[in-house]
C-alpha cells in the first residue's frame, strides 16, 4: 500500500470511486451495484501500475481491434488468497521495512495462492464487446486511472491468467489464455505482428484442454498452456503466457524466475536478470543456493516487491 500502510482486514470492501459510479451510469448495461475490477493506476509514483510487465515493457492491443483501442495497453490485475494475505500481515512484510528486517526465509502456508490476470480494454464500445464475446472472452466491468489521473470506466475482456498455488514446495504454476489473442494483441516490433504463445500448449496440456473445452462451452476458447510444479522436473523447461510475459517467452520459466524472489538488507532485491544479452535474459533453470548467500528467500512471492517503505 501507499506509504507502507498496514492493510485493512482481508474481507474489507473497497468503496467504488465516485468518478467510476458517475461514468458507469452513462454506459448501457452497467450494474453500478456489481463488481468492478480495478485495473491499475498509471500516474507517476503509483504502487498499482496496471500495464508494466517484468521486463518493464507493456503489451499493446492491435491487429483486429477498433482504431480507438489500437495501441491501448493490455491491463493486469492481481489477487491473493486470504491465507496468503494473513501470512503477509502476520510476518509484517506488507511494507519494505518488514521485508528489510527479515532474519530468515519465508515459508507461506500450503493453502496460499495468487492469481494474476490480463485484460483487453473495451471501454464502452458495444460492437467491440460483442466481437470479443463471440470469440469466447469473459467480459467484466472495470476501471483504471491514466497517467493524467483521469478515471476510465468500461468493460474488459480476460485474455490471460496465471494461477499459482502452494500445493508443492515449489508451488504449482498453471497458465491459461484465450486462443484468439493473436487477433487483438501484437508484438512491440516494427512492424508489429500478431502476438502468439511459443511455449504451448504443451503435450501434457492438450488432452486436458480437449476435455475441459467440451465440458465448458462458454469458456471453451481458453486453453491451458502448461504447468510447472517441481524444480527437479525437466519439462516443460519454458513456460510463458503471451499476455503476461510477451517479449521474453524464449527465456521464461515461471518456477525458475520466481525461485529468485529474495531480499538482502545490503543489496535489496535479488536481480534475476542474467548478465547475457544486456541483462534482459531470465533464468530458465533454478539458480544454485550459493547465488543467494546473504539473502532471505521470499518463497517464490515476487509480488512482495511492490511493498513500499513506511512513511
Give names to the regions the model predicted:
Residues 1-256, 261-311:
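Conserved small-residue
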Amino acid at each position: 500500500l501507499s506509504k507502507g500502510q498496514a492493510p485493512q482486514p482481508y474481507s474489507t470492501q473497497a468503496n467504488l470511486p465516485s468518478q467510476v459510479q458517475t461514468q458507469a451510469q452513462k454506459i448501457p448495461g452497467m450494474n453500478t451495484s456489481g463488481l468492478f475490477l480495478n485495473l491499475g493506476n498509471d500516474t507517476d509514483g503509483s504502487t498499482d501500475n496496471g500495464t508494466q510487465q517484468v521486463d518493464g515493457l507493456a503489451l499493446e492491443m492491435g491487429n483486429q481491434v477498433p482504431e480507438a483501442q489500437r495501441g491501448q495497453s493490455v491491463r493486469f490485475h492481481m489477487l491473493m488468497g486470504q491465507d496468503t494475505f494473513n501470512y503477509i500481515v502476520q510476518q509484517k512484510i506488507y511494507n519494505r521495512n518488514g521485508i528489510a528486517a527479515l532474519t530468515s526465509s519465508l515459508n507461506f502456508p500450503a493453502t496460499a495462492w495468487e492469481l494474476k490476470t490480463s485484460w483487453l480494454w473495451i471501454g464502452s464500445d458495444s460492437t467491440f464487446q460483442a466481437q470479443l464475446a463471440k470469440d469466447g472472452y469473459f467480459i467484466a466491468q472495470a476501471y483504471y486511472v491514466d497517467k493524467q489521473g483521469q478515471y476510465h470506466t468500461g468493460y474488459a475482456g480476460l485474455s490471460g491468467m496465471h494461477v499459482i498455488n502452494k500445493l508443492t514446495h515449489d508451488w504449482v504454476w498453471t497458465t491459461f489464455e484465450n486462443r484468439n489473442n493473436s487477433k487483438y494483441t501484437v508484438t512491440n516490433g516494427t512492424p508489429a505482428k500478431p502476438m502468439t504463445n511459443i511455449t504451448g500448449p504443451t503435450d501434457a496440456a492438450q488432452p486436458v484442454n480437449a476435455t475441459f473445452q467440451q465440458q465448458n462451452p462458454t469458456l471453451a476458447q481458453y486453453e491451458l498452456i502448461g504447468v510447472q510444479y517441481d524444480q527437479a522436473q525437466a519439462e516443460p523447461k519454458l513456460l510463458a503466457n503471451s499476455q503476461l510475459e510477451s517479449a521474453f517467452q524464449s527465456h521464461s520459466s515461471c518456477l525458475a524466475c520466481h525461485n529468485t524472489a529474495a531480499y538482502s538488507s545490503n543489496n535489496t532485491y535479488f536481480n534475476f536478470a542474467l548478465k547475457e544479452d544486456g541483462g534482459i535474459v531470465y533464468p530458465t533453470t533454478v539458480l544454485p543456493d550459493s547465488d543467494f548467500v546473504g539473502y532471505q528467500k521470499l518463497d517464490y512471492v515476487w509480488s512482495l516487491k511492490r511493498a513500499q517503505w513506511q512513511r
